[in-house]
Amino acid sequence: MILVLIMVILMMIFIVQSIAFITLYERHLLGSSQNRLGPTKVTFMGLAQALLDGVKLLKKEQMTPLNSSEVSFLLVPGISFIVMYLEWFTLPYFFDFISFEYSVLFFLCLIGFSVYTTLVSGIVSKSKYGMIGAIRASSQSISYEIAFSLYVLCIIIHNNVFNFMCKFNLSLLIVYIPFLIMIIAELNRAPFDFSEGESELVSGYNVEFASVAFVLLFLSEYGSLIFFSVLSSAMFFSFSILASFSIFSILIFIRSSYPRYRYDLMMSLFWFKLLPVSLIMLCFYAVVFYY
C-alpha cells in the first residue's frame, strides 16, 4: 500500500515536470515553424523559462467573479486535473501495479466525464465568453466522442482485449488518420480549438481563471496532450518513445500550420463523414475477425 502511494505521488511529479519541458519544446517548435527563435533568455537556452512561468502564474491573485462561488471556482479546475491524472492509469505499459483488464472502458468514461469540467468551468465563471466556450466544447464533445468510441472499438475487436496492450499491425493504420483527427478534437487543439477561440472569445471557458485555478487547467490540458501522444503510440506502434515524441511534434506542427476551422464545417465533418466511416470500419473489423 505504501509502495503504491509512493508510486502515485512520483507519477504526479513526473507528469508535472514533463509538462514543464513539453511547453518549452512547443514554444521552440512554434518559433522554428515561423523562422524565429523560441524563448532563449532565461538561463541556458531558456531551460528555466517554463519553471519561472509557473512561479509567475502561482503568484497571481485569483479574483472570484461576482455572484460566483469561490469553492466551485477552485474545485472545477482541481477535478479537471484529477481526471487527466487518472487517464494515465489506463496505460499498462507503465503502471502494472494499478492497471486492470478493462482499462479501455474506464478510459472512455473519463473522456466522457472530462467535458463536464469544461462545461461547469464556463458556468461558474459567470462570463458570456466563458459560457459560449463551454457550450461549444460540450457540443463538440457530443459530436466527436461517438465516432471516437467506435474507432476504439475497432482496435478492441482487432486485438481482442479491453486494454491498451497492442502490437504493431499495418491493418490498423487505416484507423490512425481519423483517430488522430479525433484526438485533436478531444484536446481542443488547432484547428478545432473553438472553445478557446482567442479572436472571438478572448480565452474561452478559462477567461476568468488565474493563479492556481488556471495552473490546474493548464496542467490538465497539456497533461492530456502528452497522454494522447503516448496512447497513440501504444495503440498503433507497440509503444515507442520515438513514436510518442513524433506524434506530439505532429500535433504542434498542425497547430502552427493550419488556421482555425469553421464551426459548422467541423460539426458536419464529424457527423456526416467521420461517423459513417467509423461505422463502416467497425462492421468491417467485426466481420473479418469474428466471421
UniProtKB/Swiss-Prot annotation:
InterPro entries found in the cross-reference section: NADH_UbQ_OxRdtase_su1/FPO, NADH_UbQ_OxRdtase_su1_CS
Q: Which domain of life is it from?
A: Eukaryota
GO molecular function list: NADH dehydrogenase (ubiquinone) activity
Q: Keyword annotations for this protein? A: Electron transport, Membrane, Mitochondrion, Mitochondrion inner membrane, NAD, Respiratory chain, Translocase, Transmembrane, Transmembrane helix, Transport, Ubiquinone
Q: What is the effect of changing N67S?
A: In strain: VT847
**Where do transmembrane segments lie in this chain?**
2-22, 71-91, 104-124, 142-162, 164-184, 211-231, 234-254, 269-289
Catalyzed reactions = a ubiquinone + NADH + 5 H(+)(in) = a ubiquinol + NAD(+) + 4 H(+)(out)
Impact when changing A243V: In strain: ED3033, ED3034, ED3035 and ED3037
Q: What is its EC number?
A: 7.1.1.2
Effect ascribed to mutating I123V: In strain: BW287
Compartments (UniProt record) = Mitochondrion inner membrane
Q: What is its main location?
A: mitochondrion
Does Mitochondrion count among this protein's keywords? yes
Question: According to its UniProt record, what is one Pfam family this protein matches?
Answer: NADHdh
Q: How does it sit in the membrane?
A: Multi-pass membrane protein
Q: Name one GO cellular component term.
A: respiratory chain complex I
- Which GO annotations describe the biological process of this protein? aerobic respiration
Per its UniProt entry, what is the enzyme's top EC class, as one word? translocase
Annotated disulfide bonds? none
**What does it do?**
Core subunit of the mitochondrial membrane respiratory chain NADH dehydrogenase (Complex I) that is believed to belong to the minimal assembly required for catalysis. Complex I functions in the transfer of electrons from NADH to the respiratory chain. The immediate electron acceptor for the enzyme is believed to be ubiquinone.
Query: What family does the entry list?
Result: Belongs to the complex I subunit 1 family.
Q: Which PANTHER family match?
A: NADH DEHYDROGENASE SUBUNIT 1, NADH-UBIQUINONE OXIDOREDUCTASE CHAIN 1
Q: What is this protein called?
A: NADH-ubiquinone oxidoreductase chain 1
Q: What is the lineage of its organism?
A: Eukaryota, Metazoa, Ecdysozoa, Nematoda, Chromadorea
